[in-house]
Amino acid sequence: MSFYNPYLVKRTFLKKAAPSRPTKEYTRIIPKCFKTPGAAGVVPHTSTLDPVCFVGDKETPILYGDGSRSLWSAGGRGGPGTGAGQGHTPVALTFHVYDIIETVYGQDRCDHVPFQFQTDIIPSGTVLKLLGRTSDDRSVCVNVFRQELYFYVRVPEGLKLDFLIQQCSRENFNFSQGRYRYEKTSKRVLREYCVEAREVYRVFASSQGFVDLLAGGLTAAGCEVFETNVDAARRFIIDNGFSTFGWYSCAAAVPRQGGAARDSWTELEYDCAAGDLEFHAGRADWPGYNVLSFDIECLGENGFPNASRDEDMILQISCVIWKAGSGEAPRSVLLNLGTCEEIEGVEVYQCPSELDLLYLFFTMIRDADVEFVTGYNISNFDFPYVIDRATQVYNLNLKEFTRVRSSSIFEVHKPKNSSAGFMRAVSKVKVAGVVPIDMYQVCRDKLSLSNYKLDTVAGECVGAKKEDVSYKEIPHLFRQGPGGRARLGLYCVKDSALVLDLLRYFMTHVEISEIAKIAKIPTRRVLTDGQQIRVFSCLLDVAGREGYILPVDRHADAEGYQGATVIDPSPGFYNTPVLVVDFASLYPTIIQAHNLCYSTMIPGDRLCLHPHLGPGDYETFELASGPVHFVKKHKAVSLLATLLNVWLAKRKAIRRELATVSDEAVRTILDKQQLAIKVTCNAVYGFTGVASGILPCLKIAETVTFQGRRMLENSKRYIEGVTPEGLADILGRRVECAPDASFKVIYGDTDSLFIHCRGYRPEQVTGFCDELAAHMTRTLFVDPIKLEAEKTFKCLILLTKKRYIGMMTTDRLLMKGVDLVRKTACRFVQETTKAILDLVMGDEAVRAAAERLCAMRVEEVCARGPPVGFLKVVDILNDSYRKLRLNRVPVGQLSFSTELSRPISYYKTLTLPHLVVYHKIMQRNEELPQIHDRIAYVFVQSPKGKLRSEMAEDPAYAAQHNIPPAVDLYFDKVIHGAANILQCLFENDSDKAARVLYNFADLPPDDL
């Protein structure tokens, strides 16, 4: 493909139409290679030509009319230019909602809204914008009026609320911009056990800003305020029994007229009152929401791209768009800077400058009805980069490119402490009307891999690979011309397609929507805003129904408490079965079983205030911080337990339904629903235990962990007292076992016990484990606490807390806290260590030898030698040494790599191995690595006395010149890799293990 670049030739291609808006001057940055093939650098160009692109060879304007429509606008519509219908005649409307945005209208908007709602915004009023799609799949924004926003206040005796508010109005100039009213009511405060409600005022305010103003003034006057942190969207959902995601109908939706009245860039826009809406909870299907997966390719002239440098342009943005839930193939689009050859299956839009490319991308987000946006590390790189280029280089106002006009936001909020570095600190993408899903963060949470590069994750999950293009090739391919850009474009599109495949693999969009529904929060907040807001919204709901109001915590109680502890492990190698039992949902069931809650708690020194309570009315827990009491269910119901009961009953019903459903789409939604409930249940304990949280109560959290420890200890005592005869009584049958058969707990980890079943065979343990766990549940605990048999190991290497390796009865190897594939180890060491582990876990003779070694002192092993079976391990070590000595290990298997994280001049020490290699490459006048490149190196044979770093060499150079490796150094890594997993055989000391392994390795005398 080719086109005339309008900024490099004196020619006008588009017919001049009558101007619909004032002429605007644009400054563009043009790559020099557009005029001189292969040239680096850029040139600025200023003109009044509007943004354009080329589709094929046809020049196409990007913006239409007054700029509120673009080439992506469906049917020529786009926002403020058109209306949803004629007149203000109400119509019936059915629509699905995926996002809720809160905004404030002032009286200056009266001409834009139907007459019946004008008084609601004088002098100002809250409007909720419900974004979604209609039943015929058209994008829609429904502006909801008359949703009341309120908080509660308790006024000290002797003071009048009227007087306090008037005083507040005199002290604040902005007071006239809002309106308020109040009513007297009675409520209980959700802080501790309380029998009688107390008099409070419910204060209604026209906006959240006005709530803050009133609350600030009343607090300063000595009043106590409640629920000032509850926004209008949350009131809308909770007070009306609505949802943040799902189907609604409206009997009287008034079409919003076109022109300046339009307040969104959806195809349709309506106004209605909150009371006109009805939510359809039983309908679970989705409309055709669009999911956009995008990726950018940048030019990094001096290493890693820097968005503030003019030369570091965005070269391409690939956009793969999928209609969620449909079987249609996704639409692949490439926004390309410069000319580009055709790419099969891809729509190529050629842009004469980066500014045109940015306009094309941002108008796509605004006008192409995109509801979900995904990518890989878009929170930390892609979105910040395009935003910085647009705002810092071109001074674009990105608020003009979201789905709404009022309360528009298009930003990335970076964490305050982002010193963790690239791809480590997590930022929040905030684009009004768009749900961002960063699949890098999702994959980090769901997977356990040696690295989380897209190529690695895609290979693991969907069996696909990236296109083979090194980012070092990007500048060359771009300047090569249309053919090079096409190759780069295919690479870019493939990345976006892989990310979309990952999203569909995990069904993340469905999962977060189900969590949003359960937690009563907007979908866009699920991935970024943590667990606290989920539980808070639900607690607010159930508390309101029971006549409670929630205090606004000031975080004065910041003392810590003893968290979950473990039963210390007994390290060693266990060659007889180890049964692992765990408590199903331990912390939630403790809350349920013991009626724990703010509403049932009585601090130890306040029991005297409740003389009507007898000893049988409450349960006492002697905590490290002092006693605390919780009243029993017949006196007061735990609101937290009520939440958990409802959620778990719903999850049970969903799982029953799941077993009978065959439709895959329905199965996916049901599965994500039950998963959402599980995740939210597990967040309840954490909600109370975070001192800086929304409503912390460390006494509750401490009680939960205290009871959890007590349950583990009781279980340990009970199981260790079960004899073969006792087991026969429990099972109602005798189990053939060794005379000295016994059960011993060798490790306890928060909610699980590792039970060494000495004298029993693995298949026997598998046969009776469920019955044993059920018996312990009935004997020791109250409903709904339940102990379950989780798994059985045939043999187990137990190292330390949270570090073990076990061979399950299915012959699958399970590792916890032990990573054989690490960035700090080369492939040769990893593979040798894995071979030793497989031998120890899989060979009966070696297993028996390992068990005997555990019972021997290190001195005894050195004096008498290891058991014969263990010599097979020594053979592997000796074989690895011979391979190193004879230079038979490929250089690639001996290579390490370290990232060049900053310019070479910024390093304080240059003796790091990868920096030594950097300087060697520089001395040889070879191409230098760039910032954020991983520099590979091997350690090669050198004269004795040299520093280890000086032994570092470029792997390619070492292979080319057949330089032998540093044998002793690599063998030492092999020894310590093996010692790391075998330390439990040698008094659980890795240094002693390494000494023993060296002692029996067959090394030449000069190497000992």
From Swiss-Prot:
Enzyme class: transferase
GO cellular component assignments: host cell nucleus
Subcellular location: Host nucleus
Reaction equation(s) it catalyzes: DNA(n) + a 2'-deoxyribonucleoside 5'-triphosphate = DNA(n+1) + diphosphate
Keywords, alphabetical: DNA replication, DNA-binding, DNA-directed DNA polymerase, Host nucleus, Nucleotidyltransferase, Transferase, Viral DNA replication
Similarity comment: family membership: Belongs to the DNA polymerase type-B family.
Name this polypeptide is given: DNA polymerase catalytic subunit
Species for this entry: Equine herpesvirus 2 (strain 86/87) (EHV-2)
Gene: 9
